[in-house]
Amino acid sequence: MTGKTRGRRSSERGIALIITLVLVAILVTLVVEVTYSTHVNVRIAATFRDDLSAYYVARSGVELALAVLRMDFEEDQEDVSQGKQSTRQDHLGELWANLDEAVTAAQGLEADLFGGGQLFLRIIDEDRKINVNLINQQSTYPIVERIFLDSEISEDYRSAIMDWVDENQEETDPGGAETRFYENLDNPYPCKDGPMDTISELRMISGHDEATKKTFEAFEGEKGSGDKGKWTLEDLLSAVPGRGPNINVNTAPGPVIMALHQDIDHLQVQEALQDRTADPFPRVDAFRDYFNNNFGIADLPPHLAVHSEYFRIESVGI
């Protein structure tokens, strides 16, 4: 074998090795790409599965809450028709008001209650609050004013709310804000000049930064909201359509009860809440008589009730 032949074969082996390495590199790249693509697709499918599962868990919560409210309404109607009570009643001792605790307890007893998912569910009585859409009415304004004074929320913010829900372009003194103010913002938008659709609109109104951060101390025995168990402004104000509801005195938080009259103090509210827990007020007249007979306060505002019409369902599936 000549040296020329050996050199050619060595060169051929070198070329074959290079081709092999290139093919291996291509195959490795393809395998990595296919593996990554498969992993991504699996993750997408798993995320879709989990999202779909969470959605149906949340939907189940909504249906459960509606069934509980329907059952409560029908029981009230039956009691009224049988003369057991003179009018419908909704209070904090009923199942709908404690549904969050009942659902949590049920999931603790039955780990697979929602097919491996978890449900956080509660029903919030919107009639326990003050309808902020009625702030410009003579009977509602003083109640909102006392709520704001108690938490040291500025008068300017109260005026800005009045301008937000009224139907004119005249600014309320002091501190009111109409479309001219909002259109000069970095991200302009018009003033609503009409009833709020949701209470979250409070965060669109001039002066909201400080006001919506304010908290109200919960009275003894109240749950409050959030980690610290205090009430926020959105816990005390609602935004409901039309004329709006009456305030349910059987479910209203302490700060709302105290805002009903300028002479109601903290101790009186605490006593009323304790008595209400033991024996909810059967009629509005009973609530008025309670404050008149016990504390000499006779001129409570109109638009009070002992039952509720508007509820909000919060259902979160995981």
Residue ranges, per PLM feature:
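Compositionally biased linear targeting/interaction segments
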Residues: 2-318
